[in-house]
Structures are given as C-alpha cells and as structure tokens.
C-alpha cells in the first residue's frame, strides 16, 4: 500500500473539515513521526511539481487548500460564477 497516496486521498475526502494528526495515525495505523514525515513528503511533492494545492494546518487540522499565489484566478472564477447565479 502506498501510504502517501492514501494520505492524499484522505486529505481530499475530509475536505474543508480537515483531519487531525491523531486521526491520520489511527486511519493509516502509523505513529505520529511517520504521519508527520508523510505530510512533509506530500507537501514537498506539491511544491516540486508546482501544483495548485498545498497542505495547510489550521485549527488543529490538516487539509488541502489552494495556493495564495493563484488567488487572482480564483477570484475571477468566483466573480464569474456569482453573476450567473441570478439567471
């Protein structure tokens, strides 16, 4: 089993709620040291590949978020879709 791939899937599934380090350990059946290494390795993969997402740690939870460098594009998307909602 590729734990890195499973972790990525877990972060996708939990969405905005995020997931605690303890829960990651429980689900993957690993200790905190290995969980932190996997999170770090996955973040490095996102950075190396210049991906549009990253791992954020907010309110005691890890989750996938978009990169701040791309905010102007996300704002255009929100602006464009908000205008079509009234049709």
Predicted segments, located by residue:
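Short capping segments at the starts of secondary-structure elements
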Residues: 14-20
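Short amphipathic alpha-helical interaction segments
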Residues: 31-41
């Amino acid at each position: 089993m590729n734990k890195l791939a499973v972790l990525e899937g877990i972060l996708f599934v939990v969405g905005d709620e995020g997931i605690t380090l303890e829960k990651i350990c429980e689900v993957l059946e690993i200790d905190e040291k290995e969980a932190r290494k996997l999170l770090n390795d996955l973040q490095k993969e996102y950075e190396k590949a210049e991906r549009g997402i990253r791992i954020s740690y907010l309110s005691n939870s890890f989750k996938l978020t978009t990169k701040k460098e791309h905010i102007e594009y996300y704002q255009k998307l929100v602006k464009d879709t908000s205008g079509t909602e009234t049709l």
